[in-house]
Amino acid sequence: MGLKRFKPTTPGRRFMIIPDFSEITKTKPEKSLVVPLKKSAGRNHHGRVTVRFRGGGHKRLYRIVDFRRWEKENIPAKVASIEYDPNRTARIALLIYADGEKRYILAPNGLNVGDTVMSGPEAEIKPGNALPLENIPVGTIVHSIEFLPRGGAKIARSAGVACQLMAKEGNYALLKMPSGELRKVHIKCYATVGVVGNEDHKNEVSGKAGRERWKGRKPHVRGVVMNPVDHPHGGGEGRGKGHHPQSPWGVPAKGYKTRRGKRASDKFIVRRRNG
């Protein structure tokens, strides 16, 4: 996995940095593991905009990725290909299990075509293998972690991220999240060893607005150039906001805590990400 830089032959290429896709071994997805994906353009089931500045973009097929690795316990699988997935920042790996079933998983760093992976309590500690946290040594780097046993992987699934297993106490393991938060997770929860691949994603630069439009992202209009009816920053003579920066719905934009009150899971947070 590397990055491509371009000579400034056009304004759009001057600062463009994109992946070279050298790790991709297959361009067409496995037909049995894709389903149609309908565009929402940022609208919910009422047709109202819930995410602004979304719409258009290239057609996509959704790749069904296996986040429930415990379903194939103790069945070895061979990596058939590493593929691009337009629906996420990470790459995906196509596995062919010994029983003939095919599944996609997130491709961790160091996983190559021809490698064998396994899930289960007895699996070896190597990238791509999935085990319960109770069977993983302290200090190991892991990703695709479940919040609840048999709940499916929810934590650390983006390109280049991982958690570190810091300790085990009773029925809980202490994990250091990518954000720096220390959190307790039940030791029966499954996690996959290694760091999610495509680590250079954070260094990519689109270079031009059109590349963002291909992804379905529309121009992000500033509130200060809107009318008063559309945004608290709108209107007025000149460009002054007139008051504290805030969202279109009046929520302060700087230094305001937006996490809603107490919740049952608070007891599992040992240290917040901001200390």
From Swiss-Prot:
GO biological process: cytoplasmic translation
Protein name in UniProt: Large ribosomal subunit protein uL2
Keyword 4Fe-4S: no
Highest taxon above the source species: Bacteria
Quaternary context: Part of the 50S ribosomal subunit. Forms a bridge to the 30S subunit in the 70S ribosome.
Compositionally biased tracts (Basic and acidic residues): 230-240
Alphabetized Pfam families for the sequence: Ribosomal_L2 (PF00181), Ribosomal_L2_C (PF03947)
Record InterPro entries: NA-bd_OB-fold (IPR012340), Rib_uL2_dom2 (IPR014722), Ribosomal_uL2 (IPR002171), Ribosomal_uL2_bac/org-type (IPR005880), Ribosomal_uL2_C (IPR022669), Ribosomal_uL2_CS (IPR022671), Ribosomal_uL2_dom3 (IPR014726), Ribosomal_uL2_RNA-bd_dom (IPR022666)
Molecular functions per Gene Ontology: rRNA binding; structural constituent of ribosome; transferase activity
Residues in the signal sequence: none
Keywords, sorted A to Z: Ribonucleoprotein, Ribosomal protein, RNA-binding, rRNA-binding
Region (Disordered): 223-275
Protein's UniProt keywords contain Hydrolase: no
Its job: One of the primary rRNA binding proteins. Required for association of the 30S and 50S subunits to form the 70S ribosome, for tRNA binding and peptide bond formation. It has been suggested to have peptidyltransferase activity; this is somewhat controversial. Makes several contacts with the 16S rRNA in the 70S ribosome.
